[in-house]
Amino acid sequence: MINKVKNAIIVRMKLLYNCLGGGNNVQGISLLRRLSNFTILGIGNMIEVKSKIPKDVNIVIYGNNHKLVVEENVTFKRGIIWFEDHNCEIRIGSGTTIESANLAVAEGGTQLIIGKDCMISSNVHISTTDSHSIIDIDTGIRTNPSQNVVIGNHVWLGNSTSINKGVVIGNNAVVAGHSVVTKPVAPNSIVAGIPARTVKNNITWDRNRI
């Protein structure tokens, strides 16, 4: 009965166009009131939102026991937050700003963690999976398993960057626009290119023109 009541409240406030399943826990309903495209198909999912999420951000959750955390003072203007399979997590740290991004955890048990005070530009893609399988012909074993993505604190991702599965980006790093990151990025460094390579070390950055 409790689960049915929760779902009814959410639908009545026009937060969810589709909420099927039970035991889904949404915290921060008042911050989601302008959201126009929200789907949960599963059970036991947790959403904890401490910042306003606008109508141009779509949240899609397929599967069970996923967790989405959006901390305080986050600005997310446009994009998609996408979950598939089960037991995945996306976390966006406090003070982070996102112009537009596609954040995807599409294989079971993976995490996509974005630290505090990050600056994410437009058309950024971050994913823990390739979504499809690449298989070794001789062994029949898949060669591209999913991996976590961890972005540290105070990281700047330029326009149209792609952060691939398994990447860890250190604090204060900068990823130049249109780069494709496939390997770890050291703290206080700039990477650029396809695939991204280190072009400068011993740096930090500031949102202001100083």
Regions found by a protein language model. Give the residues of each.
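Conserved catalytic segment of ABC-fold P-loop ATPases
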Residues: 170-173, 186-188
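Short, hydrophobic/aromatic alpha-helical segments in well-folded domains
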Residues: 159, 176-177
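Terminal amphipathic alpha-helical/low-complexity segments used for targeting or macromolecular assembly
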Residues: 1-56, 64-65, 117, 123-124, ...
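Conserved beta-strand->loop/alpha-helix structural units within folded catalytic cores of enzymes
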Residues: 100, 177-178
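Flexible, glycine/small-residue-enriched loop-and-beta-strand segment within the central core
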Residues: 48-167, 202-203
